[in-house]
A protein has these predicted regions:
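Metal-dependent nuclease catalytic cores that hydrolyze phosphodiester bonds in DNA/RNA
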Residues: 1-139, 146, 282-301
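Intrinsically disordered, low-complexity segments enriched in small/polar residues
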Residues: 6-7, 19, 33, 169, ...
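Generic structural signal for alpha-helix starts
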Residues: 23, 49, 161, 270, ...
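Short linear functional motifs in flexible/disordered or boundary regions
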Residues: 42, 74, 78, 151-152, ...
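Mg2+/Mn2+-dependent nuclease catalytic core
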Residues: 95-229
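Metal-dependent nuclease catalytic regions and adjoining charged, substrate-binding loops involved
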Residues: 177-301
Length: 301
């Protein structure tokens, strides 16, 4: 199995984005960030601590592990269980599974007088055979959790993250599927062995099913059209501070803000500080404003 996977990747096709484009992973990103990205403004240069690099690679390895497990089950499930495996990866004409480099594509969108592409790849497009023989195409999105074992508990994780749902909506349009599974895999553990009943409260994997309708896709595409209009017209949209931590264009944004926009951000941060939102959200908003103020004063950040 591993040798076959390595052979596939050794001959993986090269697919490059057709501009203008949006990535499914940016479906919920700050519109101001996407504006500066489209203009080709420089990304922030940040020093990533070694531990962040390790965490990122662990997240990638988790996705690879799940995909390998699914391929292994395709091959051996029936022999071990005594009935056909109900699911398998959809295959390309050359026999490669429909995931990662073998599913990467540019999907053209013409909407609202604008033309752009959705560019990227998915964690998998599966074929699920129901008990009555119906074949359903189901998308798969794998997400890792690493901060604590409780992140995938039934108490903490009651529904999938909204940004992950929107990412799947973009994939639904790209691959023509209306069913999706978001699988959360937790790399943290409370202990090597659990007391009876403890694991059931905080399992290391959680799966959520989505049924994606045309209206969900229309809402997302309309958002991309709005952002593309702002890019073409040179009129950037407001900053969304909710995703500031992972915003790659903080400096460009800070420098492009008008005085009125800066004042609006100050007011927003002030209101958030007085609200009853999580302390982590308050810190993120306050940190964003502090960064912006320093950049505009010419101070090193």
């Amino acid at each position: 199995m591993d040798a076959q996977i390595h052979r596939w990747y050794a001959e993986a096709p090269k697919v490059f984005p057709k501009k203008p484009y949006f990535s499914p992973s940016s479906a919920n990103a700050c519109p101001r960030e996407l504006y500066h990205k489209a203009l080709g403004d420089p990304r922030d240069i940040t020093r990533k601590p070694p531990y962040q690099g390790r965490w990122t690679r662990i997240g990638t390895a988790i996705g690879d592990m799940i995909q390998r497990d699914l391929l292994f089950m395709e091959k051996h499930f029936e022999k071990k269980v005594g009935r056909p495996c109900p699911f398998s990866f959809e295959r390309n004409p050359d026999g490669t599974p429909m995931f990662e480099d073998f599913a990467k594509r540019n999907h053209k969108i013409e909407r609202g007088g604008k033309t752009f592409h959705l560019f990227g790849t998915c964690d998998g497009i599966m074929r699920y055979v129901t008990e009555d023989g119906e074949v359903l195409r189901v998308g798969l999105e794998i997400k890792s959790k690493q901060t604590s074992a409780a992140r995938t508990s039934f108490y903490s994780l009651k529904k999938p993250d909204e940004k992950h749902v929107k990412q799947c909506v973009a994939y639904a349009e790209m691959y023509g599927v209306d069913l999706y599974v978001i699988l959360y895999v937790n790399a943290s553990k409370k202990a090597w062995e659990y007391e009876e009943g403890e694991f059931e409260k905080s399992p290391d994997i959680r799966a959520f099913g989505l049924e994606i309708g045309r209206e969900d896709i229309d809402v997302l595409l309309d958002r991309f059209v709005e952002i593309q209009n702002s890019i073409d017209d040179g009129k950037p949209m407001a900053v969304d501070l909710n995703g500031w931590t992972f915003n790659g264009y903080k400096t460009a944004i800070a420098q492009s803000l008008t005085a009125a926009e800066l004042e609006a951000i100050r007011d927003k941060v002030s209101r958030v500080k007085r609200s009853n939102v999580f302390d982590s959200t308050k810190r993120q908003y306050a940190g964003a404003l502090e960064f912006i103020e320093k950049v505009r004063k010419g101070e090193a950040v």
